[in-house]
Swiss-Prot record:
Cytoplasmic side of membrane: 714-756
UniProt similarity note: Belongs to the prespore-cell-inducing factor family.
Entry-listed glycosylation sites: 82, 359, 483, 564, 663
Organism: Dictyostelium discoideum
Topology term for the membrane: Single-pass type I membrane protein
Record's keyword terms, sorted: Glycoprotein, Membrane, Signal, Transmembrane, Transmembrane helix
Name this polypeptide is given: Protein psiP
Compositionally biased tracts (Polar residues): 730-744
Region span, Disordered: 730-756
Amino acid sequence: MFIQRTFLKVLTLLSIVTVLVHGQTQPKDKITLKAVIYDQHKFYNPNFQPKNEGEFVLTKGIVKSDIDQEKRIPVLNSMDANDSINKKARISWPDGFKYFFVDNQAGDSKSAKSGKNLPIQRDIELNWNGEAYEYSNSNYFPINGQGFNDVSYPVPRGYVPISGESWTSMSTSTSLKGNNYNFCLKLNSKFTYNGNEVFKFTGDDDVWVYINNKLVVDIGGIHSQVSASVDVTKLGLTVGTIYNFDFFYCERKTSESNIKIQTTIETYCAYVDYCGVCEGDGSTCCNPATTCNDGKRCTNDFCPDPKSPLAGKDISKYCDHIPVKTCSSKDTLCKQYTCSDDLKGDMCVIKNTVTCPGNQTNCEASGYCDDKFGCINPSKCTDYIGQCFSGKCVNGECAKVTADDCEKIIGGVCRSDYVCEPGLGCKSSERCRQGSDICDLVTCDPKATDESKRCITTVLTDEECRCCEYDTLRFCEQAACSNKTGLCQPIPKNVDDGNLCTIDACNEDEKTITHVQVTCGGCETCSYATGKCEPDSSLCNDNNICTIDICVHEGILDGLPQGNCSNTPVDCGANDEDKCKTWSCDPTKGGCQSTPVVCEDKGKCLVGTCQPSTGQCEYSDRVCDNGGAFCVIGQCDQRLGCLVFDRVCSSDNSRCEEGVCVNGTESEEGHCKSVKYDPLPFNCNTGAVVSTAVIAGSTVAGAVALGIFLYGGKKGYDYWKDSRNISMGSSNSNPLYEEQQTGRGVNPMYDDPAAN
């Protein structure tokens, strides 16, 4: 009886102390897995509730050993329905596997094999059983009466049940009718590795567990209850490091649904999405096609960032509506397109068409628009070349060729009287002309440095001068004497106009002197310097800064030298050593333009950058900013990009100590430390029996004193007060016990009636 009374007193004392020190750190009694369940139906996904043909057995190797990090879901090893593993696992529709763990509530509700599913958020609580956190349920039907199992769900017309089944009941057993057997469960979470974790699962059907993105539990297929476990300490993980923990479970066939989870892994959520799902993508309660549909085809509708604090709010008010870029991709230099929300017409319609009327200030003629080069406007002035216009534009007018221009073009020290004659071009006459006295022979000295001595007059002798006096000269002749005979020997009249591009001739019959311009074909003109047809690129000017305009000699056509215009694109950036620029030419923006090469990121966590020396894209891990705080983790997730969440520290002894994060200061770096739970759990005490120190540590003296006073009376209180400075580290330092010579401990607060 004494032992019973003493035990009851101690238990009661422990209870009071626990209440009085409420709020001090305690080891977790339970952990909550915030999962999402995807309700399935065989009408939409024939991988569920397959026919009772052949064996239903455990099947390994259905999924790949690496998780899809962008979606955080398993991936089938084979997409072949005839693959031996798929057949054994009853995966008759491999394409439907992608809907096991991904939202497809927008799937066609009227069509078979649409993959439609209904996501439902569910929590699973694992309680501490003294050795591990555990959840066990041999009748696991978490969504009975919900989803497709809801009697109000509209049954598709195409659904034909087999004997004994109905839309909401797949079991033919009376006792099991109404249970929702077809569903899949997904949990994406994290944990900080302590160095001693284990995980064990028992149940049916498919179960896959990934740790650090690697498959560690593989009990796939439709089968009866089986078990599998993993010793996390054998996975090569680093203590104190954060890893992904991903759990996938499917119930695909009647008539059992068993689940038992035992683990020492303390999972947590880096974030909870606005649907309440641990590290979810928001799809449980937000569908871009329905929740965010603004009814406009010219916008792409997106759900908000799943990390947004929108729980309990109208999510549709926070959707993103991004204008589509489909139409702008059709733009050219001549046409710009825009998107039309008018469902009756084309989606992309022309917003603007470029016209090319020509700029009068630049003497441009009306032109046309080229999709590659933009406006092509020929110069009006090129039409008048050869008609005493220079081909240049000055103040909006085509400039005429002046005498000074002609002097520059065909000038020489022995020519003068420059003039431009339409149809012929520049002309000139001899500077030193013959006078009326034929006996005075006038010549020009091109080497003379004194202009007054440029023209030289030589007086002929009477014989030389008058030898042709009595001869009759023809129109196209001029007098001249033979040096050999001294007799009259007329020579052709000099009709040279000084222009090599004219054919000078004297017509005796018509008594005329003509100067016919040399004819050239295409874009060739006669060169004043050579008198030959040569390519003239000025005739090819299209007034477009983005083309190189040149005339190319093509040969002889119809007896004439022929040139053709070539307007090739400007080679922008040809000498630019920076290969991370893309060059283009836009006449509306002043010509050559450069834009940086964009290296698209690979997924959400690899950042692309261009290397200027090679122009090649290189990729590096995305750095997520944690603000420099040690106790904040910045980590990239392939699905969602950067996540920022509190660091969860490991401890040296997870059942007796808590990992506490300490941010860095100027004098101390941030670090994790282990702090003993207060009160310390019973099994963490090193003594043989529970002590007062174990009950409440060194911070609850007042609470202990009150408890001892209540249950030990004044004698007990006085005894405690006298000994309160004694360190209590074991059972025999507990003031509730007193060491006797017999070696037995007695309670000094117990009044033995026999002693009174």
